[in-house]
Regions:
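Short amphipathic alpha-helical segments
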Residues: 95, 125-126, 163-167, 249-251
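Short, glycine/acidic-enriched loop or turn micro-motifs at the edges of active sites
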Residues: 118, 158, 243
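A residue-level signal for conserved active-site and pocket-lining positions in enzyme catalytic cores
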Residues: 27, 152, 288
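Rossmann-like AdoMet
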Residues: 1-83, 87-148, 307-310, 316, ...
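A mobile, often basic/glycine-rich helix-loop segment
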Residues: 151-199, 252-261
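Conserved protein kinase catalytic core
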Residues: 88, 121, 161-162, 246
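Conserved acidic residues
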Residues: 149-150, 234
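Long, Lys/Arg- and hydrophobic-enriched amphipathic alpha-helices
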Residues: 199-372
């Protein structure tokens, strides 16, 4: 058993079964043994994100952020808050490109990289040391209490927020708890731990079939509510894999969407090696829109990562893909990396981009150009 498994087993022995949300929270965020408390190299061995593919991802995002700044009237300080910033790769790509290609925007830019792990905050600070010294970058454990004007964004963060597991059993919605028996973690079915789960599904008008499983992302709802309150004027941009509720809870997802990732392999062995594998569940974008509206946010639009990146790159024929002095071979390699980001069989159609706003008016964003 892993060290975290020992701790969780002892907790269950003493106090009884725990919700899967509690189990997932400990597996991912325990300050010592949690998966995301480890170095970024452990994470990279299990999966990679769009940031890892090519710097053009950050460069095109920088262009979108710069346009947002323009729409806000070019405020003297534009607070760009990245939630779940990790070791700061994306921050470095956005900052470096803004400094070299978007100088007016860069002068107004205050980039805050929010990350729970102290080791990763230190890595992020080191990676953007020049921008720290120039007063354009800071790493923080918490989201700023106020964001007067700016954008708060995340890339593959919400899929890793803890979820409650549920199952329709004998015509009633039950919760799947985590128990420990016969020296292993097992499912334990019981009544819902909180009425908020019932409200979550009722809000979407979901009708489950017998034995259908689903995840309730209550923490994602709390997250969008809180960041919506802290944002005074600007945008919230969410990039993640998931669906709107009608698709997320249909009969194509009878077993839910929860997966464990280890060594680039996806499995449903959630209880294997607690703290040493990633756990994710698809994002419910309808919930983000619904709870966001309650916090004063308005949906600007939602599109695929493919459409988003292509719309942003169309203006200069994706010239941001290449570095000065690149050889033909290096340029060809960069084009192949771009395909991973935008082609349907790569990341392009699996990932969705949701943009919400508060107090910005109705100006069109380039990344959402062409959507209905």
């Amino acid at each position: 058993m892993t060290p975290l498994a020992e701790l969780l087993a002892e907790r269950i022995r003493r106090f009884g079964p725990i919700t899967f949300a509690d189990f997932m929270r400990e597996c991912l965020y325990h300050p010592i043994h949690g998966y995301y408390s480890k170095t970024e190299f452990t994470r990279f061995a299990d999966y990679y994100t769009s940031v890892d593919v090519h710097p053009i991802f950050g460069r095109l995002l920088a262009r979108q952020f710069s346009e947002m700044w323009e729409h806000l009237g070019r405020p003297s300080e534009f607070m760009l808050v990245e939630c779940g910033a990790g070791a700061g790769r994306l921050a470095a790509h956005v900052l470096d490109f803004s400094e070299s290609q978007l100088s007016d925007f860069y002068e107004a830019l205050c980039y805050v990289a929010v990350e729970r792990s102290s080791a990763r905050r230190e890595q992020a600070t080191g990676r953007s040391k020049r921008h720290v010294e120039a007063g354009h970058f800071a790493a923080s454990i918490e989201i700023p209490a106020r964001i007067p004007a700016g954008c708060l964004f995340s890339n593959e963060l919400l899929d890793a927020l803890p979820v409650h597991r549920t199952v329709m059993q004998d015509g009633a919605l039950k919760e799947v708890f985590v128990n420990f028996a016969n020296d292993r973690f097992v499912d334990s079915i019981a009544p819902l731990s909180t009425c908020a789960i019932q409200e979550y599904f009722a809000t979407h008008g979901v009708a489950f079939q017998e034995s259908q499983q689903a995840e309730a992302g209550l923490e994602a709802c709390d997250w969008i509510t809180e960041v919506g309150r802290r944002l005074e004027r600007g945008y919230i941009l969410t990039i993640d894999y998931g669906h709107r509720a009608a698709e997320l809870f249909d009969d194509h997802h009878m077993r839910g969407t929860l997966l464990a990732y280890q060594n680039h392999r996806a499995t449903e062995n959630y209880y294997t090696s607690p703290g040493e594998q990633d756990l994710t569940a698809h994002v419910n974008f309808t919930a983000l829109e619904t709870w966001g509206k309650r916090a004063g946010l308005e949906t600007v639009g939602m599109t695929s990562q493919t459409s988003f990146l292509l719309a942003l790159g169309r203006g200069n024929e994706l010239a941001d893909l290449h570095e000065p002095g690149q050889t033909e071979l290096e340029q060809a390699r960069a084009r192949l990396q771009l395909k991973t980001l935008i082609y349907p069989e790569g990341m392009g159609e699996r990932f969705q981009v949701l943009i919400q706003q508060k107090g910005t008016g109705s100006a069109q964003l380039t990344g959402l150009a062409g959507i209905a």
